[in-house]
């Protein structure tokens, strides 16, 4: 009987040890290979930071900032980027496409957005007026419209997205599966909006159309060299607190933020 128990117990112990070693290796690899980030703001709601209004609670996760990942970016992936728009004070000396390193990280605005258009494509938005009118008929205030799933469904159906590939004459409608947060009173601005992207240019937008500073808001693309990384996963939530420090390299003070009180959940992969 004892011999039978040993024959059963020892293999189980070995399997548990091997499992723990594998998990430890994966965790160590992830922590060193990927870069940790936290999501600030509401521009990616309802996908990210859905609870950000609750006392500074935000999502945190991992991005892949290696060139191998950035060079293979696909449509609708979520990325982190520094913005090239001069009026947002993201660059001290403006933007120069010929320079390899155009970002002054002391001044840059660090964003997380979703990729809509890839280099050399032409993107187009079209509005279905019947769906737009259905959304408007059911809403009395912007707050109600943004919080009503029924109204938001009509809003999402109203804004349709098309892409024309390089060297093609045909626009192809894209199937958008992720949810977007849209102000029905501003849908008309998307009607027949079109933009032709050049080499190394990307079109990115936040999922929260009603509160996102992005390519549509600025009517301008971002560039390959602005991209920092591709979102791999959201690992949990944390609370962000400000950390004001004296910056000896520039005049004044520098405000940075850190992620505290981390609460992990099962990773959500993107």
What feature does the model see in each segment?
Residues 28-48:
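N-terminal hydrophobic targeting segments that direct proteins to the cell envelope
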Residues 5-13, 35-38, 50-270:
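Soluble "head" domains of membrane/secretory-pathway proteins
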Residues 10-30:
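Hydrophobic membrane-insertion alpha-helices, especially the h-region
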């Amino acid at each position: 009987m004892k011999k039978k128990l040993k024959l059963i117990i020892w293999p189980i112990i070995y399997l548990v040890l091997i499992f723990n070693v594998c998990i430890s290796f994966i965790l160590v690899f992830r922590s060193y290979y990927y870069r940790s980030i936290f999501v600030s703001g509401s521009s990616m709601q309802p996908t990210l930071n859905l609870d950000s209004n609750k006392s500074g609670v935000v999502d945190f996760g991992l991005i892949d900032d290696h060139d191998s990942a950035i060079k293979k970016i696909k449509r609708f992936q979520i990325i982190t980027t520094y913005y090239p728009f001069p009026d947002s004070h993201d660059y001290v000396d403006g933007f120069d496409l010929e320079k390899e390193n155009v970002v002054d990280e002391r001044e840059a605005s660090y964003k997380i957005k979703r990729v809509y258009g890839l280099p050399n494509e032409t993107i187009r938005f079209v509005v279905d007026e019947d769906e737009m009118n259905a959304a408007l008929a059911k809403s009395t205030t912007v707050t109600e419209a943004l919080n009503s799933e029924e109204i938001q469904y009509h809003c999402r159906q109203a804004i349709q997205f098309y892409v024309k590939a390089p060297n093609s004459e045909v626009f192809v409608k894209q199937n958008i599966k992720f949810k977007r947060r849209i102000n029905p009173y501003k849908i008309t601005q998307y009607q027949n909006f079109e933009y032709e992207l050049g080499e190394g240019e990307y079109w990115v937008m936040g999922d929260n159309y009603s509160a996102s500073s992005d390519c549509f808001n600025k009517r301008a693309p971002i560039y390959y060299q602005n991209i920092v990384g591709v979102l791999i996963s959201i690992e949990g939530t944390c609370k962000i607190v400000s950390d004001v420090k004296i910056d000896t390299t520039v005049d004044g003070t520098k405000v940075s933020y850190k992620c505290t009180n981390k609460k992990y959940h099962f990773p959500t992969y993107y």
